[in-house]
């Protein structure tokens, strides 16, 4: 989500949600597995730092990207930030609900606010992502 983690730490709120059943990237994206597909979104920490999200652009549907590559941008009232894939693969779907109402990301970041679905190239990349406890250490 954002490469400048150190700048975010000073603004961390203690009530952020980090579900234990998800994996996380150091760029502040979360990932959950549904079969051979990864569902990806930004973390509660990321959305809290961005503020009110007004537009999400994912021009990469149908493309195959490597883990760590930019798959889209997230525009908030105060900034625009790149979104990075935590796992590589083909982007098979962009969340139409987020396209219609980007504020869903702020309201339900781990549910209806998911961003993309990716058919993973290498499922082992998922295993290499951060656990909830490790992600909490990163942001805390």
Kindly label every feature range from the protein language model:
Residues 2-73, 103, 107-140:
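Acidic, low-complexity mobile loops and tails
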Residues 22-25, 82-88:
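Short coil-to-beta-strand transition motifs
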Residues 44, 78, 87:
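A short beta-strand motif that forms part of the nucleic acid-binding face
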Residues 47-48, 61, 90-91, 97-98:
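Short, charged/polar surface micro-motifs in flexible loops or helix N-caps
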Residues 76-79, 96:
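Short, conserved catalytic or interaction motifs in soluble domains
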């Amino acid at each position: 989500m954002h490469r400048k983690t150190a700048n975010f730490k000073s603004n961390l709120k203690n009530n952020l949600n980090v579900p234990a059943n998800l994996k996380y990237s150091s760029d502040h994206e979360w990932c959950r597995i549904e079969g051979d597909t990864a569902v990806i979104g930004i973390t509660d920490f990321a959305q809290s730092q961005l503020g009110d999200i007004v537009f999400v652009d994912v021009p990469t549907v149908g493309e195959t990207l490597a883990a760590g590559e930019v798959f889209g941008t997230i525009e908030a009232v105060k900034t625009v930030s790149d979104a990075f894939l935590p796992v590589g693969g083909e982007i098979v779907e962009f969340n139409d609900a987020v396209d219609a109402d980007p504020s869903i990301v702020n309201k339900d970041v781990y549910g209806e606010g998911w961003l993309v679905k990716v058919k993973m190239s290498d499922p082992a990349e998922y295993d290499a992502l951060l656990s909830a406890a490790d992600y909490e250490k990163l942001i805390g």
